[in-house]
Amino acid sequence: MKIAVFASGNGSNFQRLAEQFPKVVKFVFSDHHDAYVLERADKLGVANASLELKEFTSKVDYEKALVEILEAQEIDLILLAGYMKIIGSTMLARYKGKIINVH
């Protein structure tokens, strides 16, 4: 199983998850290019990417690009750990039953 962690900022939840489950936490996504979670991921050797909604003409296009990234990483499960965006219909359709919000 490959897990992606979504985070919008610091990434302390991601770091705990990655340290506890290093064999399955394989990818980090952030909706901010300057989020510290990306630096944490780099330090732990976890693949990562970021996209910002303002770079796209619509949320649908944003989520389509995100789905492409996740599919390329062969992600099975998504953990929302401090992710501050609302997940839209494109993501929900593709990952139905495979998204867990961690608070």
List the predicted regions and their residue ranges.
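One-carbon transfer enzymes
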Residues: 1-102
